[in-house]
Design a protein with these regions (language model features):
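Solvent-exposed interaction patches of small proteins and small membrane subunits
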Residues: 1-126
Length: 126
């Protein structure tokens, strides 16, 4: 992401990645996921995207992030760093658990934050 976006842009990236993770894991169980390098790579990549977008919000819209503590911005970025910089030691069981438990819990929080961001960035005309 080369150009700084508004918070809504980063949140939209996060939602797209969340949706992709849901599609890539749908119909799979953990055993099938462990056998599919393509699914593993796709999920890992989208976790990285979520984490990078979270970092960009912390950097470019810190006040917004501070108002939305329901989203674990730093934890998301930390997971991205572990995956990106420790690719040879990625624990796929943790990736699976994150994809099927944590990511679905994150989705409504990001959706709500996006609604707020859009209202703040585009206030209604009076």
């Amino acid at each position: 992401m080369s150009k700084a976006l508004r918070a809504s842009g980063y949140l939209d990236y996060m939602l797209q990645a969340i949706d992709r993770i849901g599609r890539y894991t749908a119909g799979h169980d953990e055993a099938a996921f462990m056998q599919s390098e393509m699914a593993q790579d796709a999920v890992v990549r989208n976790i990285e995207i979520i984490g990078e977008a979270a970092h960009d919000i912390l950097k470019d819209a810190p006040a917004f992030a501070a108002r939305h503590t329901e989203i674990p911005w730093k934890i998301l970025y930390g997971m991205r760093n572990k995956i990106s910089h420790g690719y040879h030691v990625v624990d796929l069981a943790v990736v699976w658990q994150t994809a099927v438990e944590s990511v679905p819990e994150l989705a409504p929080k990001v959706q709500n934050a996006l609604k707020v961001a859009l209202l703040e960035e585009n206030p209604p005309q009076r």
